[in-house]
């Protein structure tokens, strides 16, 4: 007896809402490819997308292995969102020396549904790694190393998504086609 599992409309809508955070930036990087989350409505495209993602995971190719320093954020509940939130605040106030931003562990805890203790542990780890400093006066110093870390993470993330979608930039198409015929 075979059991066939099929995604529900509600499940697909939630998947598309979640994946729009990846598809939208990639569509900006490759405007001629007409990339949008509605590609996930196509069973074959959706299957191939997740098959490629699974191949990376099964080979052990994770963010923490490729970019281990980002693990102090992304391996924690809400850590990825906290990292991105701090980055976006820092970019608004960026100087050559980093940025100084308003900071409240309580605000981050409420925003990302984690405890203040959890936020403080993430911040303490990031501070010990030299990415930022809680100034203790409601402000935080964000160092250039943190900004570089997040930008490296984002670049890797979008590279993964580009591969999962199977986008091959025009300048590589000819070379890819030639090697596949050899």
Predicted regions and their residues:
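A short, conserved structural fragment
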Residues: 1, 127-137
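Minor-groove-contacting beta-hairpin "wing" of winged helix-turn-helix DNA-binding domains
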Residues: 1-7, 138-144
């Amino acid at each position: 007896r075979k059991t066939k599992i099929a995604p529900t409309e509600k499940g697909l809508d939630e998947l598309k809402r979640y994946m729009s955070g990846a598809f939208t930036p990639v569509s900006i990087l490759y405007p001629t490819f007409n990339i949008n989350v509605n590609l996930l409505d196509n069973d074959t495209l959706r299957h191939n997308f997740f098959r490629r993602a699974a191949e990376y995971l099964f080979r052990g190719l994770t963010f923490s292995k490729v970019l281990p320093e980002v693990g102090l954020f992304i391996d924690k509940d809400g850590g990825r969102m906290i990292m991105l939130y701090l980055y976006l605040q820092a970019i608004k106030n960026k100087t050559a020396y980093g940025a100084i931003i308003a900071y409240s562990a309580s605000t981050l805890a409420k925003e990302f549904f984690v405890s203040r203790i959890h936020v403080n542990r993430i911040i303490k780890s990031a501070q010990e790694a030299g990415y930022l400093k809680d100034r203790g006066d409601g402000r935080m110093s964000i160092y250039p190393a943190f900004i570089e870390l997040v930008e490296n993470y984002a670049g890797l993330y979008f590279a993964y998504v580009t591969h999962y979608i199977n986008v091959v930039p025009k300048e590589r198409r000819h070379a890819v086609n030639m090697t596949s015929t050899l």
